[in-house]
From Swiss-Prot:
It comes from Macaca fascicularis (Crab-eating macaque). Residues 57-66 have a biased composition (Pro residues). The gene is MON1B. This is Vacuolar fusion protein MON1 homolog B. Keywords: Acetylation, Phosphoprotein. One of its GO terms (cellular component) is Mon1-Ccz1 complex. GO terms for biological process: protein targeting to vacuole; vesicle-mediated transport.
Amino acid sequence: MEAGGDTAAPVPGGAEDLEDTQFPSEETREGGGVHAVPLDPEGEGLEETGSKDKDQPPSPSPPPQSEAPSSTSRLWSPAAPENSPTRSPESSSGGQGGDPSDEEWRSQRKHVFVLSEAGKPIYLRYGSVEALSATMGVMTALVSFVQSAGDTIRAIYAEDHKLVFLQQGPLLLVAMSRTSQSAAQLRGELLAVHAQIVSTLTRASVARIFAHKQNYDLRRLLAGSERTLDRLLDSVEQDPGALLLGAVRCVPLARPLRDALGALLRRCTAPGLALSVLAVGGRLITAAQERNVLAECRLDPADLQLLLDWVGAPAFAAGEAWAPVCLPRFNPDGFFYAYVARLDAMPVCLLLLGTQREAFHAMAACRRLVEDGMHALGAMRVLGEAAGFSNASSASAPAYSVQAVGAPGLRHFLYKPLDIPDHHRQLPQFTSPELEAPYSREEERQRLSDLYHRLHARLHNTSRPLRLIYHVAEKETLLAWVTSKFELYTCLSPLVTKAGAILVVTKLLRWVKKEEDRLFIRYPPKYSTPPAPSTDQAAHNGLFTGL
């Protein structure tokens, strides 16, 4: 993987011919604005940003009868702590009791609604079902009216508000936003919300439920999942890297230790085991995938991020759990069986995905082998120090300071390598430092997130995509750059000049090149599991028929 450290940054002289534009409703210093360069400093043409056809997953087998919709509500939900009651279907998702005329409700920057085609509410980010029933009725009527004319409603723009609609089978998802997110970015956020719902029930189960009863109240089966959806939407506001870049973030770790942990996962296998993941603080340590299961289908980063968010639920703070989970991008109609455990009272989490429903004890034995191996490697102590936990599970997620780069004037950045030689072996990843002053407060983090979203939308504009954007704002200077090797967003001090920004970015690229073995997983390990028992378990093989 090339980090782009040897790539020459654009020279200051070439920046004088930049086109001057300005973000809407954004104050800038005199002589500032946005400078966009639709040219590649390396002389390369712009790569296509459209989605490509992905390999088709193996043919799934339907979930066992015990996982039919009628019994799914009895499955333990990691989104709801065991010592707290789940919210009733009539309760508010966001804890805000108001309607569109309520000032507190109107003050929210973004609202997300999920409802059925019949107008039955499923999830609300803020407000109560009773107060917003009329609003959701209007949404359903709008969609039905446009569909009756043989068309599909995608978005509505009204002054500084956007309404984005997404129809996914029998579910209607709507985002109402006054943030700087583009319609495409809001649609991606709605897809992530839909994926979270599908991960609990599967797409086939949702379709079967509403085919049987159109006005079914799906909240009964999703009780407790509202908190997971809330956390997902909060992360977009304050830490947008994963969803914005379509990648996962790794824990910075010395390559020898990461390779040793990968080899440990490769050795500790069980029949039907498809994927092993070590994570801490919602970030990936390493992962190993079974050769036969995932050899022809790359694990999508959206699915992996969903798993990382899932195991970050408060209910996984201690002990172990066994529950079915669906990976929507891999196969939206089937279940894996997930074993989740915290290791040695540490925040390190082990996730084992298998295809056999009765494999809990085999997975638990595998966990003990992993735990013993990590102690032998001294990994527990190293991970605890890297995360800054000191056995305190309430501490923040593992990260590094932007000061480690050694580039004065650099406040924050998002970096995603794009030179991935083998998409079946390499996970899309990104790295970013911890948000520090002046972005310690929530409103400042939201403002930085808005700036990143604006830059991303300009770089990936379908009508006029850009290569380089230099933006001088009121409180910071930003530079966004995409090449064939990387995608980079940097936030700099407002006092940094154009020439100074180029020097900072050059130093940052050299640092990433030097540290890439520590920041990224170069080649996720693969392994072959022991053969599955030849008993009657073939009919209960979970997701796959050929194992």
